[in-house]
Amino acid sequence: MKKSFTKQLISLILAVCFTLAFPAFSFAADSNQSDGEAKSESIYNEFKKSDGELICVSKYGDTDKFPENSAEAVAAAAEKGADIVYVSVKKTSDGYVVLMADSNLSRMCVDELGNTVNKNIGDVGYHELSSYHLRAGTGSLHEPITSCKIPTLAEAIQYLGGNAMLMIADGWEYRDEIYDILAGENALSNSIILATGDKKEISSWLASKTVMPLVISSSAKNGNAKSYVSKTLSAGCIGTLLSAKNPYNSVFKDGVQSKFKDAGRAVIDMTNSDICGGREDNPTGWNDITKRGFSVIITNDIEGFNAYRARVKSYKTSLTSDLEKAQATDTALCSTSIANKLKKTITEAKSTLSSSMSETELMEADYSLRLAMEALADRTENDNGKTVTPGRITAVVLVVIALIIFEIVFDTLRRKKVSKRRTENGRAHSSGKK
């Protein structure tokens, strides 16, 4: 009886364990999916803030490990830390939207025999296209052949799994097909379409959709940048991709950048110096471009840019902390010039915090603020933790002098009163004797 009870108890425990185990695996899968969705949603929410944090956009995915525009490169870029992956799309002869930068396949593709494919993608059907292999990295004859294939846009979205957003370029002419693919993959909220149309075209297209897609306009072929930015942002775009060969072009100046305030994001492609004013895709280039107002950076160096972004965040945190200390400082007993200098530096620090993503600007603002704080005095603290400054020392000395003067005056008056009483008492005594 005892053995039977023990067996039943063990069986019951095992049954409960198995019952709990299967839902646990199910929750784990759901949790992973939710993590991806939550990540892309977080990036989307950050992107929507015109004064938000820097955004890292990987150009064509992680090409150090996989062929550009491959599903594997896209997913690897997200794993490496990219917020968004920039991809180019083309359309096959039978209407499939696939990832490919060039109209001609010769740079990236080989057939099953290893021969370079010298065909235009618009002349090839998807069935034939899917038999080709991609060359490694950015392609060309010197790159080895890989097992990677050309993915459809839908396959790339599925492979990415919501771990980053997609920025879809070169597909504006078949935007309706792209929209339908995104809607079918439930990816309208984590994919961005790059629009090359004018305000009227963009506005009309957005208005025709029941669910608003995310769109960034591109000023490359649209004349006056200042006007284009203003008009396309008001039409519903969440940002504008700007480009110029001249480093002093208006797109890098306050007139154009001011149009993004509380309206959208300024986007720049740093992977080609000819379209970003001769600047390089490195910390020096990022610092200069973020100083000018750009906050969404298309790069080939995900890890390098993320390191730069981390330094910017660190300097912002430091400046915020020092700003709070400066604002809490009592300057009532300091000289007017020193107090005014601190006040001016505080104003400049606030402006930098609210408008700049440049590493050097944040660093310089923090340094200036610390210098202004140190200029208040050779600061020390007494046993009670009170700050002692020359102004306060002078005040204490003046108070002591006042007390001494008061004591002298009080003592003089007291002596006069005593002397007067003695005189009066002497007179009264003399009158009594008479």
Residue ranges and their predicted role:
Residues K313-I393, V397-V399, L403-K416:
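Beta-rich interaction/scaffold domains
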Residues C17, D30-S31, A328, S351, ...:
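Short stretches within intrinsically disordered, low-complexity N-terminal or propeptide regions
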Residues M1-F5:
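N-terminal secretory signal peptides that target proteins for export/translocation
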Residues R414-K434:
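Cytoplasmic C-terminal tails of single-pass
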Residues S11-L14, F27-S314:
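Phosphate-group recognition and catalysis centered on beta-loop-alpha active-site segments
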Residues T6-F27, A395-D411:
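Sec-dependent N-terminal signal peptides of Gram-positive bacterial secreted proteins and lipoproteins
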